């Protein structure tokens, strides 16, 4: 059995395919993610699993250099923004973009996976940009 934190085979596979600058997204239950082979739907019910638990687990196995968040999270969900910042290392760039731009980035060929959680708080979506480990 796998010893590392991520047990979901689809998430583990997506992380293992990442190269420098590739993207992986973690989304709330309401984000309109494409229904394609990159969709990893974890949502069981409202708030299960929650966004922050999935993010924390993914970060144990993924080296990141930048994150993208919706500009709207600053006012609509400041508590979630604070929780995200606690998990992100100081050397990781945080870029705020319009929520509409985030929706378009989900379709990027650089995006290797769209993880849907059961999160039901507004703008609980993040795009993780991969870094190298050397």
UniProtKB/Swiss-Prot annotation:
Locations listed in the record: Cytoplasm
Q: Which InterPro entries match?
A: D-ribose_pyranase, RbsD-like_sf, RbsD_FucU
Catalysed reactions listed for this entry? beta-D-ribopyranose = beta-D-ribofuranose
* EC number of this enzyme: 5.4.99.62
| GO terms, biological process | D-ribose catabolic process
Q: What class of enzyme is it?
A: isomerase
Residues binding substrate: 28, 99, 123-125
A Gene Ontology cellular component where this protein is annotated is: cytosol
Entries under PANTHER family matching the protein:
D-RIBOSE PYRANASE
What's the family? Belongs to the RbsD / FucU family. RbsD subfamily.
Query: Subunit comment for this entry?
Result: Homodecamer.
Q: What's the protein called, per UniProt?
A: D-ribose pyranase
* Gene name linked to the record: rbsD
């Amino acid at each position: 059995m796998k010893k590392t934190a991520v047990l979901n085979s689809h998430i583990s596979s997506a992380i293992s395919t990442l190269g420098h600058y590739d993207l992986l997204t973690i989304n709330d239950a309401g984000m309109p993610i494409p229904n394609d082979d990159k969709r990893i739907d974890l949502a069981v019910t409202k708030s299960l699993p929650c966004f922050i638990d999935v993010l924390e687990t993914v970060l144990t196995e993924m080296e990141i250099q930048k994150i993208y968040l919706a500009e709207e999270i600053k006012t609509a969900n400041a508590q979630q923004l604070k929780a995200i910042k606690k998990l992100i290392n100081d050397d990781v760039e945080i870029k705020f973009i319009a929520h509409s731009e985030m929706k378009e980035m989900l379709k990027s060929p650089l995006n290797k996976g769209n993880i849907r959680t059961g999160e039901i708080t507004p703008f609980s979506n993040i795009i993780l940009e991969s870094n190298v480990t050397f």
